[in-house]
Curated annotation (Swiss-Prot):
<dbReference type="InterPro" id="IPR023799">
    <property type="entry name" value="RbfA_dom_sf"/>
</dbReference>
<comment type="similarity">
    <text>Belongs to the RbfA family.</text>
</comment>
<protein>
    <recommendedName>
        <fullName>Ribosome-binding factor A</fullName>
    </recommendedName>
</protein>
<dbReference type="InterPro" id="IPR000238">
    <property type="entry name" value="RbfA"/>
</dbReference>
<dbReference type="InterPro" id="IPR020053">
    <property type="entry name" value="Ribosome-bd_factorA_CS"/>
</dbReference>
<keyword id="KW-0963">Cytoplasm</keyword>
<keyword id="KW-0690">Ribosome biogenesis</keyword>
<dbReference type="Pfam" id="PF02033">
    <property type="entry name" value="RBFA"/>
</dbReference>
<dbReference type="InterPro" id="IPR015946">
    <property type="entry name" value="KH_dom-like_a/b"/>
</dbReference>
<dbReference type="GO" id="GO:0030490">
    <property type="term" value="P:maturation of SSU-rRNA"/>
</dbReference>
<dbReference type="GO" id="GO:0043024">
    <property type="term" value="F:ribosomal small subunit binding"/>
</dbReference>
<dbReference type="GO" id="GO:0005829">
    <property type="term" value="C:cytosol"/>
</dbReference>
<comment type="function">
    <text>One of several proteins that assist in the late maturation steps of the functional core of the 30S ribosomal subunit. Associates with free 30S ribosomal subunits (but not with 30S subunits that are part of 70S ribosomes or polysomes). Required for efficient processing of 16S rRNA. May interact with the 5'-terminal helix region of 16S rRNA.</text>
</comment>
<comment type="subunit">
    <text>Monomer. Binds 30S ribosomal subunits, but not 50S ribosomal subunits or 70S ribosomes.</text>
</comment>
Amino acid sequence: MSVWDPKEILDSIGLGKRTEVKRSTRVADAIRKELAVLLLEKIRDPKLQDVGISRVTATDDLTIVKIYYTIYGPHKHVKAVDKAFLAATGFIRSHLARTLNMRYTPNLQFCYDKTAEKVAEIENIFQEIAKERQDNGENS
């Protein structure tokens, strides 16, 4: 009769050992959280009202951070939001320097995240295919 060992069971399904997360991933996650707080509480620019941070990536040497954002609501004013982020970059970097306690604050690059639009396109294609199949099934 074998003794039940939870560590052995977790190891067998790949959950026993912690996987090490890269520092750049941890820093990117911290920056994403700080930016979310900044957008909600401190940045007063009306162009950034309907903006959310979808993901943040950082280079391994932490010199460049790419911040991907989405725009909620009916107005997709990407150029205006880009200009607003460009104007607020200094404020955002200084805030990140104070809160993250890093020796060097990375350069910030803001990029519009087109993932939501691509998902909507694919969903529309699937709906069209389903409608065509339904129409072909009725005509047969």
